[in-house]
Amino acid sequence: MVNIDIELDPKFYGPKDSIVCSLLSHVMVSEGISQADLLLIIGDDDLLADLKNKFFGINHYTDVIAFRLNEYHKKNVEGEIYISLPRVKENANKFEESFHKELGRIIIHGGLHLLGYKDDTKNNKLEMEKKENLYLEQVNWGKLYG
């Protein structure tokens, strides 16, 4: 079973839990994971910048950070995904994409990172983008809000 808890900074209006859970559950099951305990935390730029600096020694804004809490060779997944809602909105404008689709993509992206996918090279980025596009086609992300 894929268990997902969602925490939201109270200054934001968050996406529908059911759609977020559908996206992440679909990624996990499609990638062969039947047991997962995930925490999705939706916050702001400062939260993610602090995490990026503290854990990676990099001082800049980012839209998503994922931490796998157990070993990658384990069949179950325990992890946390942090998303900056303002950064997702800015990136949606930058990439001329709807906010809902960009948020769906970032949720999927975080899930893929928990599974060991990396975006540190051009080829790895392309592989992740293919997976993101595939899963965006398969799940109804269009109603993340409202």
List where the protein language model places each region:
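Conserved ATP-binding N-box helix of the HATPase_c
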Residues: L112
